[in-house]
Amino acid sequence: MRKSADEMFIGVRRAPISSNVGGTSFYGGDEYCSYYQSNGGVAKEDDGSAKKGFRRTGKGKLTAEAVSEAINRAAQGLPFEVVYYPTAGWSDFVVKAEDVEASMAIFWTPGTRVKMAMETEDSSRITWFQGIVFYTYQETGPWRGSPWNSFRYKIPFTIPLIFL
């Protein structure tokens, strides 16, 4: 997320936590705002101005210009930051290093079957999405030699396997 002072913040949250203490919903950055409002104080930036928190009500989301800037920086091989608005059920956004190393050891070819598990919103069951590697290609851009994004896959429009 980006603040008006051009600061970027990145965070990963497994699931939303909601509470209505004092009429305020603690969701995302709301607990920050609620803390300072309930204690009668205001957090200060280094320059003395009031610090602004982020809320999940739409305030604080990235602008199209910020996304475009990150894309341009990535295309030039410069450092950039990734912002992700997680939702419950998006499992495995952060992947174990062992899983990455194991997948990099696989010789990916067209026709290779792939499968991804995703939890439902209430975490009561797991849905498996299956796909097939459609084609592989040699990366020629600034990420040449990187194992990431070196193949495309299709997920057939079939009913996913659901395990209770």
From Swiss-Prot:
Subcellular location field: Mitochondrion
One annotated GO biological process: response to hormone
Disulphide bonds in the chain: none
Mitochondrion listed as a keyword: yes
Top-level taxon of the source organism: Eukaryota
A single GO cellular-component term on record: nucleus
Primary location group: mitochondrion
UniProt keyword terms in alphabetical order: Mitochondrion
GO molecular function list: DNA binding
The keyword Hydrolase is assigned to this record: no
Extra information: A stretch of 270 kb of the mitochondrial genome is duplicated within the centromere of chromosome 2 resulting in the duplication of the gene. The expression of this duplicated gene (At2g07677) is not demonstrated.
PANTHER family cross-referenced by the UniProt entry: AUXIN RESPONSE FACTOR 17, AUXIN RESPONSE FACTOR 4-RELATED
Protein known as: Uncharacterized mitochondrial protein AtMg00940
Organism: Arabidopsis thaliana (Mouse-ear cress)
